[in-house]
Curated annotation (Swiss-Prot):
PANTHER family: THIOREDOXIN-LIKE 3-3 (PTHR47571:SF1). This is Thioredoxin-like 3-3. It comes from the Eukaryota. Keywords: Disulfide bond, Electron transport, Redox-active center, Transport. The keyword Aminoacyl-tRNA synthetase does not apply. It comes from Arabidopsis thaliana (Mouse-ear cress). Belongs to the thioredoxin family. Residues 1-24 are annotated as: Disordered. InterPro entries: Thioredoxin-like_sf, Thioredoxin_domain, TRL33. PROSITE patterns: THIOREDOXIN_2. Disulfide bonds join 55-58. The active site is at 55 (nucleophile), 58 (nucleophile). The keyword Disulfide bond applies.
Length: 126
C-alpha cells in the first residue's frame, strides 16, 4: 500500500549528502525521468532502488545500497522514493524493488532486501 503523503524522505538525503556514496537521488518525477533517460541513452549498466521513507525494510537496506555503490563503480546507482516520484513509480507494487538495466533495457528485477542477496545480484550485473 502506498502512503499518500511523504514524511520528509528527501530531508535525510539532503542533510547527509556525503553519506549517499555514488547514488543519484531522484527528488521528483521530472528528475527521475531525466535520470532514466540518461541510463537508457548511455547504455551504462544501472540499478534503481525503489523505496519509501515509511518502509522499514527499505530503511534497513539503504545504507548497504549506498555502501555497495562505492564497490561497484561500473554500475550507476539510483534511488527513487515512490512518494516523491508518484507518477513515474506507479508501476512499483513492492518496496524495496530493485531494477537492473543493461544497454538501455531493463534486464532483471529483485523484490525485497538482503545485503548479501543484493551484493550477489549487483555482482552478476556489473
Amino acid at each position: 500500500m502506498r502512503k499518500q503523503e511523504s514524511e520528509g524522505a528527501n530531508l535525510e538525503f539532503e542533510s547527509k549528502s556525503n553519506d549517499n556514496g555514488n547514488v543519484k537521488i531522484a527528488p521528483n518525477d521530472q528528475s527521475f525521468l531525466t535520470i532514466l533517460d540518461d541510463i537508457k541513452s548511455s547504455k551504462s549498466p544501472a540499478v534503481i532502488n525503489y523505496g519509501a521513507s515509511w518502509c522499514g525494510v527499505c530503511s534497513q537496506i539503504l545504507p548497504a545500497f549506498r555502501k555497495l555503490s562505492n564497490s561497484f563503480s561500473k554500475l550507476k546507482f539510483v534511488y527513487a522514493d515512490i512518494d516523491e516520484c508518484p507518477e513515474t513509480t506507479r508501476h512499483i507494487r513492492y518496496t524495496p524493488t530493485f531494477q537492473f538495466y543493461r544497454d538501455g533495457e531493463k534486464v532483471d528485477e529483485m523484490f525485497g532486501a538482503g545485503e548479501q542477496r543484493l551484493h550477489d545480484r549487483l555482482w552478476l550485473h556489473s
